[in-house]
Swiss-Prot record:
Primary role: Cell wall formation. Catalyzes the addition of glutamate to the nucleotide precursor UDP-N-acetylmuramoyl-L-alanine (UMA).
Major subcellular site: cytoplasm
HAMAP family named in the record: MurD
Family: Belongs to the MurCDEF family.
Organism: Coxiella burnetii (strain CbuK_Q154) (Coxiella burnetii (strain Q154))
Protein name: UDP-N-acetylmuramoylalanine--D-glutamate ligase
Gene from which the chain derives: murD
Length: 442
């Protein structure tokens, strides 16, 4: 195998396997390595590519040295010592999004942010379908991007994580946005500013930047070539909220579009998502009627502030996707404002090095009891114990039972962990499913 053209894929999950399939289809020489002894796709890989070198249980410096280019899976940090050493030597290190960007010519809508990106990506994709466009919704959502190149759609709507953006250099989008920023993945970034810089890469070579007017610190110093299109709940923006006939309505540049009461989801963070989706859709020239019709009918996504059931006049919400402090803060604030009573919060898991103190004010205002689970429950207790009643649970089943005992008619039980799930569950979906099943069994 010639090292002059050798590509080394680091990481053999879904993304790594999709990269292997893409390179194999192009007859590009490649090898694969993963530090795990049994990475998720290794059995599929060796059946399909029995003659391709696969190193498991370690990273091989010798193989990395031989590579002309390295494709890094998003789960592997650029700070991994052997990877950082290759980068310092000037080796090209890319991700699957970069490989995708080099090989597509169709318009791309690109979306990132700490919270709401899956919802906004989904909504924009549905808006395009409602307008009769053939669209592929992919990236950090659904199937890997490299599996969506053939057959090629009319449009791509991409959800992108900071990890994916770090290794992307050729993305040229019709419109792109950073929805918001709050602490997340601080186990991978030294500072919040480093995390923001990774996110800001989404605006490189973007034709129409879409910006959050409520968080100007994200974008105000960036050298945009074109005037941004903005959305915002609190500040003057192209897409905003306005009072009309004693009703709060969505407005575009001062023109009333529809009252928020017509939306099935009209809590504060849902409205921000709707405004962002409208701005992105406008940049993609989707007719406003199609977008408004879609928003009226949209009832949300599983595990994202999803209403589960009412039991003894207590409402139960599954926000298992609330894997960081910002997401949980937004969920507490939105549901707290709408609740007749108070909130009982189920939180905890792997905190990823986050600072939990931004939860203090909303917990003090809306939460009468917190049920803590998981690895970083002691850190959450240390932050919140002076503010509200703290209880602990060893399982989701116990957490739901304790929450139900603490709740009264009109209260809300909210699972929004502010943490990753891997200490107790397979992933956040598994955590949300266990919560939902437990609630439905009450």
């Amino acid at each position: 195998m010639s090292s002059e053209s050798l590509t080394v894929i680091v990481g053999l999950g879904k993304t790594g396997l999709s990269c292997a399939q893409f390179l194999a289809a192009k007859n590009q020489p490649f090898a694969v390595m993963d530090s795990r002894e049994e990475p998720p796709e290794w059995e599929n890989f060796i059946k399909t590519y029995p003659r391709v070198e696969l190193i498991r249980g370690q990273f091989s410096e010798k193989l990395l040295n031989e590579a002309q280019e390295i494709i890094l899976s998003p789960g592997v940090s650029l700070q991994e010592p052997l990877i950082a050493k290759q980068a310092a030597q000037g080796k090209s290190i890319i991700g699957d999004i970069e490989l995708f960007a080099r090989n597509v010519n169709k318009p791309i809508i690109a979306i990132t942010g700490s919270n709401g990106k899956t919802t906004v990506t989904t909504v924009v994709g549905l808006m395009m379908k409602a307008a009769g466009r053939n669209v592929s919704v992919c990236g950090n959502i659904g199937e890997p991007v490299l599996e969506q190149i053939t057959p090629e759609p009319d449009y791509y709507v991409l959800e992108l994580s900071s990890f994916q953006l770090e290794t992307t250099f050729s993305l040229r989008s019709q419109a792109a946005t950073i929805l918001n920023i709050s602490e997340d993945h601080m186990n991978r970034y030294a500072t919040l500013q480093d995390y923001l810089r990774a996110k800001q890469r989404i605006y490189t070579d973007c034709f129409i930047p879409i910006v959050n007017a409520d968080e100007p610190e994200i974008w105000c110093h960036l050298p945009f070539n074109k005037k941004p299109l903005s959305f915002g709940l609190n500040n003057a923006a192209d897409f905003s909220l306005a009072e009309h006939n004693q009703k709060t309505s969505i407005a575009y540049q001062g023109k009333i579009l529809m009252p928020i009461q017509e939306l099935k989801l009209n809590a504060r963070h849902h409205l921000q998502n709707a405004l962002a989706a409208l701005a992105l859709g406008t940049a993609a020239k989707i007719p406003i009627e199609n977008m408004l019709h879609l928003l009226r009918d949209f009832s949300g996504i599983r595990h994202r502030c999803q209403w589960v059931r009412k039991y003894k006049e207590i409402d139960y919400y599954n926000d298992s996707k609330g894997t960081n402090v910002g997401a949980t803060r937004a969920a507490i604030e939105s549901l707290g404002q709408a609740a007749k009573g108070q909130l009982i919060l189920i939180a905890g898991g792997q905190g990823k090095g986050a600072d939990f103190s931004p939860l203090k004010d909303v917990v003090k205002r809306y939460v009468k009891q917190v049920i803590l689970i998981g690895e970083d429950a002691p850190l959450l207790e240390k932050t919140l114990k002076e503010i509200t009643v703290i209880k602990h649970a060893d399982s989701m089943n116990e957490a739901v039972k304790r929450s139900t005992q603490a709740a009264k008619a009109g209260d809300i039980v909210l699972l929004s962990p502010a943490c990753a799930s891997f200490d107790m569950f397979t992933n956040y979906e598994h955590r949300g499913d266990v919560f939902t099943e437990t609630v439905e069994a009450l």
